Design a protein with these regions (language model features):
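Glycine-rich phosphate-binding loop of ATP-dependent small-molecule kinases
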Residues: 1-192
Length: 192
């Protein structure tokens, strides 16, 4: 089983590459945004609790987020080939909580794949995406803020995963297929 954290700044291509990994390897996919929306939409107990925090403009506590992810992770069954964690963890305490949740099931993170893209390219991709899709969070000012949050709050996780011995740096420039070939190279070298 190969549980993988896909990691990178906004605009690095995490969603695009996750889709390609799912297609090639048959992995499950846990995107925190999608998971939260589904739990709330389905009216689960966890979803109702999460909605209370969201409605009050509060961040969802790490413990609740891990409970929600555990619920989804367990729904894949014991014979899945692995799961891609997309959008989680974002902080060291979240990474530690995810590690503990997986250990309780006799599992682990096999790799943290960091898609590394230069700042100028991220800005260009995100602003272009905003123009094409009409996403209001992809204008220049908001993009700069999102990248700053990534660098100050999320990027320190790279060192944590390096210490865990599962960090894999992947150059995120080039065509989608070029980048995916680099990811496949990393995944195929992982032991079961």
């Amino acid at each position: 089983m190969k549980n993988i954290v896909i990691f990178g700044a906004p605009g690095a291509g995490k969603g695009t590459q996750s889709d390609k990994m799912i297609e090639k390897y048959g992995f499950g996919h846990i995107s925190t945004g999608d998971v939260l929306r589904n739990e709330i939409k389905n009216g689960t107990a966890l979803g109702k609790t999460a909605k209370g925090y969201i409605d009050n403009g509060q961040l969802i506590p790490d413990e609740l987020m891990v409970d929600i992810l555990a619920h989804v992770y367990d729904s894949f069954g014991s014979d899945h080939k692995g799961v891609i964690f997309d959008g989680f963890p974002r902080t060291t305490p979240q990474a530690e909580a995810l590690k503990k949740m997986l250990q309780e099931r006799g599992h682990k993170i096999a790799a943290m794949i960091e898609l590394s893209v230069p700042e100028e390219e991220l800005m260009a991709r995100l602003i272009n995406r905003g123009k094409e899709s009409g996403r209001s969070d992809d204008n220049e000012e908001t993009v700069k803020k999102r990248l700053n949050v990534y660098h100050t709050q999320t990027a320190p996780l790279i060192d944590w995963y390096k210490k865990e011995g599962v960090h894999h740096h992947v150059e995120g420039l080039g065509t989608v297929d070029d980048i995916f070939a680099r990811i496949v190279n990393e995944i195929d070298q992982l032991s079961e």
